[in-house]
Amino acid sequence: MNEVAANFSAHPVLEGDISTGRLERVLRSGRFAVTAELNPPDSADPEDTFRQALVLSQVCDAINATDASGANCHMSSMGICALLTRAGYSPVLQISCRDRNRIAIQGDVLGAAAMGVHNILCLTGDGVETGDQPGAKPVFDLDSTTLLSAIRGMRDDARFLSGRRISTPPDVFLGAAANPFAPPYDWRPLRLAKKIEAGAQFIQTQYCYDIEMLRRYMGVVRDLGLDEKCFILVGVGPLASAKAARWIRANVPGVHIPDAVIERLAGARDQKHEGKQICIDLIEEIREIKGVSGVHVMAYRQEHLVTEIIQKSGILKNRIINAETARSARRTEEATAVS
């Protein structure tokens, strides 16, 4: 463990701003950050995206545009980011290695940066067999770690993987996913260390429903000094019922839901309300854990619940976040830069 920690002294990834994006500014200021997932529509109507984004923007520092999560096809992450940047929102482009090779991915990074996307989350991606088109041909030319390294090289060295020069490199804030709640547990902090070494500057975790397990994980993360090398946002989300929780635990890989949580739901008169309250309670405990920099809220097809959960948790106390505030701040920054 000490040897791993020592290797990070040469990688001060948190020194100095990388992008001009809101998420990085909030994290570097020491404020507790909030991100959330926009579940992409099965539609070509931009209003379907804008309606969801408007709800999330009231409480979020950045909005994740998922990239065919679960290997199911929806509007692309790139398309959603194009819409969100045009409307003045701060998106997180998710890139899954499942569907595109290194040539396409590097081109997407440049295109996204040119549109004003400042945040990229690098993912290996779910296997095609988990989705509704299992006959699709998987690519996996890169994985999440090699993708992080590739984009970092584009940004910091202004070069493609081929070695060819990039005239204007992308100024992107790099993120990755982590799952503290799946075995082998001892290996999870070491996996995080490898992603940070590859270039990850922020981390969004899988759903957390077990605070004690998170505390143990963060204890090792702090011992390794990894919390000083990246910003960790812990995944949370409401459970609709005890039945839904049992189904998720049995069918969604990597999601750990303790018996005590399911029993609490099962014993509630209004299980949906209790699921929201459990999420709020978890956020209140998560914010007290040293080394945690924020939360990442995932509420599938329930964006309206995100605002209620975040507001009731109190983590945005004394902070005002909405679309108009973000646009005003952006106009002020642009005017300052010009002057």
Language-model features, listed with the residues they occupy:
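Short, low-complexity, charge-dense intrinsically disordered segments
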Residues: E324-E334
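Active-site mouth loops of central-metabolism enzymes
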Residues: A33-D48, S69, P91-I103, V172-W187, ...
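Active-site-adjacent beta->alpha loops and helix N-cap segments on the catalytic face
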Residues: D45-E47, A71-L83, N101-G107, G127-L147, ...
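Glycine-rich, positively charged N-terminal anion/phosphate-binding segment
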Residues: D17-L23, E47-V55, A71-Y89
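Conserved, mostly hydrophobic/aromatic
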Residues: E37, I63, A112, K195, ...
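Active-site pocket-lining/capping segments in soluble small-molecule metabolic enzymes
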Residues: P12-V13, P138-S167, A177-A182, L224-L282, ...
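N-terminal amphipathic alpha-helix/helix-capping segment at the start of soluble metabolic enzymes
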Residues: N2-N39, S43, R51, R159-D171, ...
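Glycine-rich anion/phosphate-binding loops
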Residues: C97-M115
